[in-house]
Structures are given as C-alpha cells and as structure tokens.
C-alpha cells in the first residue's frame, strides 16, 4: 500500500469517527422522553380548549413518572369520592369491624333520588349485603346505596383513614343528594394529586392486604358508564369511578394496561357545558392510552410489533 493511499484511508476513518462522535444515537430513554413531552403538550392543548377548569394527574406505575395540571387544586368530586368510601369499607372489613356479607333491609326513609335500583326495591322486605350495596354504588352510582354505606362505616372513619395517608385535602363531608349541606358549602372534595395517591396506595397494597386489594380492584372495575372508559379499547379494564354534578365532570381510576398500568385522574369544573367536560375526559383518556400502549409494546428503539 502506497503512502498516499494509506493517508487517504486514515483521513476517511477519522472522518467517520468524527461523525459518530458528533451525532451519537439517542438512548432509548431519551426517545421515550420526547414522546412523553409531546403527550404533555397535547394535555395542555385539551386544557386550553376547555371552557372551564381542568385538573389532571397522570402516573406511570412502571417508571414512576408523573404529570399534573392544577394538581393541587381542591375540586368537587361528585361520585368520584365513592372511591374513598369503598376503600374504607374494605379496610373495616379487613379489620373485622364489619363483614361484606352483613345484611341490610331496605328502608323507605333511606331512599333518595339518583337511585335507579334502590328505588325499585320493596322497602321492609328486600335484603342486601354490604357487598351488594357497594356493587350498586360502583356500577350505577346508586346514591341510596352510597348513603347506607356512609352511615355504616361512618363519615369520620373515612376522613380518619384519609388523614392517616396524608390526604388532608380529600374530604367526605356530606351524604349524596344532601342539597342543604351542599348549599352550605359542605362539598365532597379532593385534588388530582391526592386522588392519584389514594389509588396508587391501594394498587401497591399499602392500605389493604393482598386479598382485599384484589377484591377492591375487581369491584372498582365493575362495568359502568364512564368517559375514561370510553377513551379505552373494550379489552382494557380500568378500576375507576366517574362523578357528575352541575358544571362538574370527573373520572379517576387505575388503567390496568398489560405491561404498563397507569393512573389517570381528570377533574373538570366551572363548565359552561357539561358535555365539554365529558369530551375532554374522553380525549385525555384516549391520548394517555395511545402513549402507554406504544411504550408497553415497543422495543428500546420504538419499534412496535403487533400480534397477528
């Protein structure tokens, strides 16, 4: 090999080496971070387009990453507060303070509006277990069933449990359909961050034992009308509870996506049109699922191979 040819070869190798150093391949985490940042931009776009106020908390239960919009704002929960009530019901069952098989006889004085099932039952005759009441509370948001459970577990015990978890902004302050209490400002409230924390605490088995945790998640996964669920494919389950009041639409839950479960809490208030709140929740849910589904099925390079 001539000296001139050798010199050209060395120059070429040096050039390739320099290109590699100035343009290194992005690590897998950086690629995913870019996708995560784009998702956050889409969240903000939904928030800016909503004629109302939106609170949002998202948590990747695999990586621990979180994102918030108005994460610490106290917001009305409507029926989403029933997540805290259900958690305390299961906690008291675990502590042998009550049994989920304990029976209750329907009483006429316990019936309130927003109770599609309870209002159709025969007072003084029909017997229901606490588990039956919990199922009605979750599946159809039956307010009479909810009020019976509130009286059975004790509002003060629900709030004491929340205090023990450091969730001081999350409060159960009144029974369902208590318009007098609502008019006095006694609203059932939480923040996106605290509701997310409550759900994660339960999911990770830090409140209930393994058996009770599994039963709780199964109960909260009971099929229901839900904007969060409408943003998911039919084969993806979520342990969630929506809530509705005038000018308020909420939905909070654990999305049980295989390989990449996550928590999503969306709260909307000051709505001019409640349909806009529901639409925003559906959009946020669909966007979040799209991100986590890709991350769950992708290689470190972002290649997704779908099953045939």
Regions found by a protein language model. Name each.
Residues 1-25:
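Bacterial Sec-dependent N-terminal signal peptides
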Residues 22-49, 152-154, 197-226, 233, ...:
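Structured C-terminal helix/loop/strand segments within mature extracytoplasmic catalytic/sensor domains
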Residues 38-71:
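A short, well-structured edge-of-sheet supersecondary motif
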Residues 53, 126, 147-199, 203-204:
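Mid-domain, small-residue-enriched loop/turn segments at the edges of structured enzyme/sensor domains
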Residues 55-59, 67-68, 84, 105, ...:
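Soluble periplasmic/extracytoplasmic beta-strand elements of cell-envelope proteins
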Residues 61, 100-117, 153-154, 219, ...:
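Acidic helix-start/capping segments at beta-turn-to-alpha-helix junctions
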Residues 64, 76-104, 264:
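Active-site SXXK
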Residues 111-147:
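Conserved catalytic neighborhood of penicillin-recognizing serine enzymes
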